[in-house]
Amino acid sequence: MQNYDHLGQVFKNLRTNRHISLKQISNERVSAAQISRFERGESDISLEKFLIALSNMHIEVSEFMDAVNNYQRTEQICFMSALIPLEYERNIAGFQKMQAEEAWEFSEHPDIYRHHLNVILLQSFICKCDATVPFPEEYIDEVTDYLFTTEEWNMYELILIGNLYLFIDIPLLHRMGQEILKRKDYYWEIGSHKNLVTITLLNIWETCLHRDALTVALFYMEKIEPLLNDETDLYKRTIYLFLSGLLHYKQGEKQSGIEEMKNAIQIFEWVGSENLANNYKKDFERFVR
């Protein structure tokens, strides 16, 4: 069994939550000492002994695997939550500390590729804080290989694309965007995934505009519009208004494009989103001549 320290922790959580002692689940075929070492991640345990211990707790394998998956999701949510204040503070040292921790985890557990992907994800935050720091090309290759050999793209895969899009060339990024659109019916069943899909597609659209890939940008404008049918979703609809204005401006419809961009900035000001208003003012000044 791989990742036995991780599985051992889940096993221990299930046992202690049920107030079951090691003695109660041990017998002549699996000792309390063996189970204890497995729980602490100090040694592996054979599949036969593991199934005996699980059966002695009256837990089905499917129930255990549900707990494992939930543990992994919780672990990743904690990781992502730690990034938010660091990004707000532009705390490069904090990102580097987390990156070193993830690199160590991967060196200890090379079969848990998520730790290496977290190293790459953290590098993207460092590069966004300091534009002089290069983003290694091999990281893009590794992420691309990972994504296109992963059958289902869930929240983590969307987060990867949504944070690495600045470093991916347009043809490859467009390919990723098209894959997301193919799967959107699946994502639409889960509210958090639906929101992340829309934000990721808006990011792809924005970087296409910034890099003057107008044909691809028009593709995303047309695909994103029907996704924004909720009138209460002011944030994403306002970003859409600004980006559509920028596209129209770059296509030569300068006056209507300027009006759309100014209207979007004004909406952010009206609702008190000063940081967003200022960010889009900078974009406006950057592109409007």
Residue ranges and their predicted role:
Residues 87-101, 132-141, 170-182, 211-222, ...:
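Helix-turn-helix repeat elements of alpha-solenoid scaffolds
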Residues 99-107, 141-148, 181-188, 221-229, ...:
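Amphipathic alpha-helical segments of tetratricopeptide repeats
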Residues 66-93, 266, 270:
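Short, charged recognition helix plus adjacent turn
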Residues 157-234:
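Alpha-helical adaptor scaffolds
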Residues 1-17:
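A short, Lys/Arg-rich alpha-helix, primarily the initiator
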Residues 10, 49, 81, 115-126, ...:
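"A position-specific structural signal for the A-helix of alpha-solenoid helical repeats
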Residues 19-37:
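Short alpha-helical DNA-recognition segment
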Residues 48-63:
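DNA major-groove recognition helix of helix-turn-helix/homeodomain DNA-binding modules
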